[in-house]
């Protein structure tokens, strides 16, 4: 009876170790991710403060240095309604950042980065005949986000993300800065 019990325990331990090794993520090599969701922008213009809720995008491209750490180029797009000109129009208050993403657990990750903050036209709301609308402005930008992978299979993962970014730019009317928070659903390939 003792040998049968010992044999059963050894089989269970072996099966458990095998199942755990199959569930561990295989993050290596190049990383690509894209997410979309909703963003809330708090922007302080020289003449007024503005709050907007609109569409958000995020993209990232990089390389896994090890199964827990990736170095990335990360883009954050947060659309807002600019109304300090002759017509209301949509613009992006986001940026492009060099960032590091670290997996605290096999599903939960944190990301931080610094780069170029932007105030740029949104391609689907440009009137090319108005040259003011086609101007890009840049400055300092910071990004921080957290995410949780809700589904993973092989080198594909689906995650939920919360992002905050700070941008400061010099517009023709003066220095403009603000925070944008976003909640996103993302797809990632490792």
Regions found by a protein language model. Give the residues of each.
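Outer-membrane beta-barrel biogenesis signature
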Residues: 3-5, 11-35, 149-151, 155-156
């Amino acid at each position: 009876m003792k040998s049968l019990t010992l044999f059963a325990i050894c089989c269970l331990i072996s099966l458990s170790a095998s199942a755990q090794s199959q569930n561990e993520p295989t993050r290596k090599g190049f990383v690509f991710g894209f997410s979309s969701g909703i963003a809330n922008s708090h922007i302080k213009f020289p003449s007024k403060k503005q709050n907007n809720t609109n569409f958000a995008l995020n993209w990232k491209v990089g390389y896994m240095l090890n199964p827990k750490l990736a170095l990335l180029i990360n883009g954050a797009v947060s659309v807002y309604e600019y109304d300090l000109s002759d017509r209301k129009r949509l613009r992006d208050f986001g940026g492009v950042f060099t960032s590091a993403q670290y997996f605290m657990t096999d599903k939960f990750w944190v990301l931080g980065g610094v780069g170029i903050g932007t105030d740029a036209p949104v391609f689907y709301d440009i009137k090319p005949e108005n040259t003011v609308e086609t101007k890009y402005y840049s400055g300092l930008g910071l990004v921080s986000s957290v995410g949780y992978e809700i589904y993973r299979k092989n080198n594909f993962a689906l995650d939920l993300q919360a992002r905050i970014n700070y941008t400061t730019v010099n517009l023709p009317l003066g220095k403009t800065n603000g925070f944008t928070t976003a909640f996103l659903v993302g797809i990632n390939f490792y």
